[in-house]
């Protein structure tokens, strides 16, 4: 195989030539090549080393001595800006008990310069006592300072009495699409989904210059994992402005496909404006939340939770809200990307999409997560051309307790990635970081092995829904690009596309399954320039 922009009688200049590599082009045929030439950030030739050196010349020739090259990896669902601006908060990821959290925030409170004590990352499912915390200890330690600690999934939080008072929350407060937890008629401090907004609007934003600094720092981490593009789900106009400012200052090189948050104040402006691109930043649609998360029992189910009788979760807005937005977006070139975890939420959004789009189409409207699907609803994705955008590490993070929530029968139809892939023949993959870790290698491993990082369980979790290695790589490259209408620019190593690629120390397509997570990204290139 050799692919050029035409055949040349004389050597053409290139900024960079890669030779003696094993290059997975991830083109339609999944061809491999040995060599690649790059000019002005674009790929101008791919083929055998001898042919590339015959047709191109460069002062920068990199002999990879057999190392493996993949297209730059794309995260099809994450919260880049949200995670970056969480950096000033108390980090609660990996905590194993409520006591450990109390210790962390007590230390943080001594050094934090802001009045609010704001933390994120706890998960009660990792504790010996798998129950939501309450505010009692927080009230004792911080009676005059507001405390707000968000769960790992971003769909629940515990607040102390000071924070509740600032927000005006009492035992009689109610909100659509959220839960203000009471026990014995008293506030516990637990807030789920929309109830969280009552407090969050009072928490001050970080300074713009700090946000831009954190974008740059998080970008470096993403590049180190081989990510060259990502889909940032649910950002504000202010955040978009900060991204563009960071890009203008040359502190942001990451390709970002942004989905705006579901804010009615944005509708007219963005529907009129349509799809928007500023260099590496593209706004392509709206991110909408239909329900909450399974871990905090906010996912909207068709039947009761197996571990909470009489409770089915809830939709975060009434059906009319989703219908009206879908109808408005139909007349634009913007995508609708709706978070749906529970089988009831997924069915609701599938039905609304069908009512608006009327069957087969190429609008590429998405359902983010598509986590629990009623067995009778899978074919609706294919019937209506709806794209499930999934995060394989959710399966291996939730597998320890998901059966408690769903029972054996429903669990069979959860995290069913192979079944979902069959519907349209392609499936974009992401991480949902910071809910999960940034590493796309863990996405790959979870998708193909259905195991956690300790290689548990031995036979894989519901292995019948594992993806092949080729499917997983496509999901992290060309299919992720396709989910954003960017497959002509990025996602594979072909002439005319951006020279976004990574060099790794072992071949993910052939290395033994238990060695996948040992793979190291050696170098990352974006637009032909080395960024890691």
Question: Positions of the model-derived regions?
Answer:
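His/Asp/Glu-enriched, well-ordered alpha-helical/loop segment
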Residues: 327-337, 344-365, 369-370, 375-379, ...
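Extended low-complexity acidic/polar segments
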Residues: 144, 278, 308, 380-397
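Divalent metal-binding segments
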Residues: 13-19, 24, 28-269, 284, ...
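Short, glycine-/Ser/Thr-/acidic-enriched flexible segments
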Residues: 23, 43, 67, 124, ...
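Active-site-proximal glycine-rich helix-loop-beta segment
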Residues: 77, 385, 500
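Bacterial Sec-dependent N-terminal signal peptides
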Residues: 1-13
């Amino acid at each position: 195989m050799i692919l050029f922009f035409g055949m040349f009688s004389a050597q053409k200049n290139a900024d960079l030539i890669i030779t003696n590599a094993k290059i997975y082009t991830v083109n339609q045929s999944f061809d491999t090549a040995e060599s690649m030439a790059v000019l002005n950030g674009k790929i101008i030739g791919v083929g055998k080393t001898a042919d590339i050196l015959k047709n191109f010349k460069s002062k920068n020739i990199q002999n990879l001595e057999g190392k493996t090259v993949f297209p730059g990896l794309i995260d099809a669902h994450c919260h880049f800006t949200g995670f970056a601006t969480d950096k000033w908060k108390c980090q609660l990821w990996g905590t194993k008990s409520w006591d450990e959290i109390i210790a962390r925030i007590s230390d943080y409170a001594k050094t934090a310069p802001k009045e609010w004590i704001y933390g994120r990352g706890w998960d009660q499912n990792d504790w010996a006592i798998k129950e939501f915390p309450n505010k009692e200890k927080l009230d004792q330690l911080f009676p005059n300072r507001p405390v707000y600690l968000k769960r790992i999934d971003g769909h629940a939080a515990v607040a102390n009495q000071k924070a509740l008072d600032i927000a005006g929350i009492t035992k009689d407060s109610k909100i659509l699409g959220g839960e203000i937890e009471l026990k014995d008629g008293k506030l516990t401090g637990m807030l789920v989904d929309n109830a969280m907004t009552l407090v969050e609007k009072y928490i001050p934003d970080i300074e713009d210059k700090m946000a831009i600094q954190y974008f740059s720092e998080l970008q470096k981490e993403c590049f180190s994992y081989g990510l060259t593009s990502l889909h940032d789900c649910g950002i504000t106009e202010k955040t978009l402005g900060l991204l563009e400012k960071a890009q203008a200052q040359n502190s942001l090189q990451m390709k970002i496909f942004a989905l705006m948050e579901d804010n009615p104040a944005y509708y007219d402006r963005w529907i009129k404006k349509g799809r928007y691109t500023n260099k590496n930043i593209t706004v392509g649609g709206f991110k909408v939340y239909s329900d909450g998360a399974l871990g905090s029992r906010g996912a909207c189910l068709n039947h009761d939770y197996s571990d909470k009788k009489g409770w089915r979760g809830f939709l975060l807005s009434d059906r009319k809200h989703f219908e009206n937005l879908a109808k408005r977006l139909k007349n634009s070139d913007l995508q609708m990307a709706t978070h749906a975890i529970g089988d009831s939420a997924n069915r609701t959004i599938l039905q609304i999409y069908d009512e608006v789009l009327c069957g087969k189409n190429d609008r590429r409207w998405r359902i983010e997560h598509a986590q629990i699907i009623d067995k009778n609803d899978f074919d609706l994705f294919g019937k209506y051309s709806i794209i499930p955008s999934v995060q394989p590490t959710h399966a291996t993070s939730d597998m320890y307790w998901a059966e408690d929530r769903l029972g054996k029968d429903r669990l069979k139809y959860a995290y069913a990635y192979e079944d979902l892939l069959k519907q349209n023949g392609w499936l974009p993959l992401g991480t949902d970081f910071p809910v999960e870790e940034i590493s796309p290698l863990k996405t790959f491993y979870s998708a193909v092995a259905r195991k956690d990082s300790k290689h548990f369980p031995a036979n894989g979790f519901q292995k019948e829904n594992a993806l092949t290695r080729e499917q997983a790589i496509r999901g992290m490259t060309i299919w992720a690009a396709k989910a954003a209408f960017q497959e002509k620019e990025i996602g594979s190593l072909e002439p005319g596309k951006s020279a976004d690629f990574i060099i790794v120390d072992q071949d993910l397509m052939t290395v033994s399954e238990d060695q996948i997570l040992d793979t190291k990204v050696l170098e990352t290139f974006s637009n032909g320039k080395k960024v890691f």
